[in-house]
Structures are given as C-alpha cells and as structure tokens.
C-alpha cells in the first residue's frame, strides 16, 4: 500500500505543478473548462488517499472493527502503514473537513448577501448603475446575473468603452464564471497545493471574458485600452461583493498584452501533457483503492475461514 500511496502523492504534486503551466498555453475557455474539473478530481483524490491511510489505523480500533468482518490482529499484522502516518492522515482529513465546511458556509452566506443586496434593483440580465464615487464594474453570479457599474466609472467611459465593459461582464454571466471560480476555490481549500492552479483559473476566467468582449466589439485594441483605463481610474477600493466578477480583476498588464496580440492558438502539447498527468493521478488513486481493499480482505475473518476450509 505504501508504494501505491507514494505514487498517488507524486501524481497529485505533479498535477499541482503542471496545471498552472499548462493553463498559460491553453485558450482561456479551454483552460477553465479543463483545469476546474481536474482540480476538483485531484482534490477528491487527496481526500481519498488521506482517508485510505487513516482507515488502516481506525480499522484496528475495537470500537470500529466491531462494525466490520475483519480481525484487528490480522489487520495490524498486514498493515504496512506506520501508525504515526495514519494518525497524521486522520488529523489532516479532520482539519480539511472542518476548514472546507467553514469555507462553504461563508460562501453560501456571501451568495445570499449578493442576492439580497442586488436582485431587487432591476430585472435579471439588465445593467444597474449604482450611485457611487468608487470606480467599479462587476457581475453578480448566474442564473440571476446582473451587471453592476458605478456612476463614477460609467460617467468616465466613452460609449465604446461602455460596450466593452458590458460585454466583459455579460461574458461572466453567460458562462457562469463565478461558479467555475468557486469550484476551483473549493479544490484549493481541500488541497492547498492547488492554490496556484486556482490563481491560474482566475486569470483564465478574466481572459475568457476579455476574448468574448473582443469578439463582440470586434476591436481587440479597444478592449485592451478600456481595461487599462478602467484599472487606472480605479483609485479606490472595489465596491463589489467578493463573489462578483470584475472587469479589472486578474493581472491587468498581462491581459492587456494578450489582447494586443492575435487570439490565442491551440497548444496540443500542453493539453496532452495535462491529460497524461490526470490519467496517472486517476490510475494511482485507483491503485490506492484496490490496495486498501486487499488489505482489509486479508484481515477479513470470513475470507480467512473460507480459505482455511477450502484450500486451493
């Protein structure tokens, strides 16, 4: 079991390193659609590996073994996982569970606050201009998505620049970017090694909206100029809620540089490399599952009894 767990851990670390690098060489939409489910799957693999390690120690406790068919003596004899490693895995799993539940409760509270504060202002899909001196524009989460622009920013923009901002924010709503980002944050909450991947996903989401805006207004230079100008105008703190998607989010200089270049091309090598890492992660996690099952099968008193009376 030790080798299976070691392989799974190496695969998880490899994904955590490779994913942000691959994200730079994929189109923003593809990067988001690939990295988010891959991150969630890797986080799930992390939980499974920790659980499998913890189970080897928990299964030796008489109170737990009473609910199963295995022998604590046989399990202890067959278990290759040192007790300190298993106990540490249980502690990490417990802390991760508590932290994730706390994170989830805070995000639900924030989502409800966004809905409470903005849903009554105007029908879904419309543009709301807030009377605020803060320069900002953001989109509330779909399906009840709304584009919010402060009066300070709205008045400072030209009509064409307003079109860019609205196209950018509507892209966030149309493609449910808030939910993609939340899923990535969930994964990195479970496994902190995935935080760089979550940051790459946030950048990809903003770039995705930039590319959509460039398609809608048919002028990449205008989009780049609008993003840069909006960032310069934003001299104060944002007024938008934490769960909103803003036009000035992400790495603004990098976004501007990308818009001044041709649309991103497909990079099959990055896609293939990431898929290979994902396949290895899945295979090693399955290996941990099979090894763990075999370990408990060895300790199963019923199976041992059958083998004793029916030798091969």
Question: Predicted segment positions?
Answer:
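Cytosolic-facing loops and C-terminal tails of multi-pass membrane proteins
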Residues: 2-9, 13-17, 85-110, 229-312
């Amino acid at each position: 079991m030790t080798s299976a767990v070691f392989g799974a851990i190496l695969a998880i670390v490899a994904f955590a390193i490779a994913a942000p690098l691959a994200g730079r060489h994929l189109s923003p939409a593809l990067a988001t659609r690939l990295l988010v489910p891959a991150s969630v799957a890797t986080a799930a693999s992390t939980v499974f590996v920790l659980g499998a390690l913890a189970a080897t120690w928990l299964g030796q406790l008489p109170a737990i073994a009473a609910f199963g068919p295995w022998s604590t003596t046989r399990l202890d004899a067959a278990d290759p996982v040192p007790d300190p490693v298993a106990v540490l895995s249980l502690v990490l799993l417990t802390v991760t569970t508590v932290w994730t539940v706390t994170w989830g409760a805070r995000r639900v509270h924030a989502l409800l606050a966004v809905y409470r504060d903005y849903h009554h202002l105007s029908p879904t899909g419309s543009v709301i201009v807030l009377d605020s001196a803060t320069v900002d524009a953001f989109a509330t989460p779909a399906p009840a998505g709304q584009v919010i622009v402060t009066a300070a920013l709205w008045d400072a923009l030209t009509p064409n620049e307003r079109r860019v901002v609205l196209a950018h924010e509507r892209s966030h709503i149309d493609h449910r970017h808030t939910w993609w980002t939340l899923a990535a944050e969930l994964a990195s909450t479970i496994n902190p090694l995935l935080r760089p991947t979550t940051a790459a996903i946030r950048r990809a989401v903003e770039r995705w909206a930039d590319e959509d805006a460039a398609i809608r207004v048919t002028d990449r230079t205008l989009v780049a100029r609008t993003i840069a100008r909006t960032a310069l105008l934003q001299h104060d703190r944002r007024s938008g809620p934490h769960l909103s998607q803003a036009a000035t989010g992400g790495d603004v200089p990098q976004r501007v540089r990308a818009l001044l270049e041709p649309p991103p091309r497909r990079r099959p090598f990055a896609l293939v490399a990431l898929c290979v890492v994902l396949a290895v992660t899945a295979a090693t996690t399955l290996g941990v599952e099979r090894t763990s099952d075999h370990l408990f099968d060895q300790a199963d008193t019923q199976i041992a009894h059958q083998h004793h009376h029916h030798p091969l």
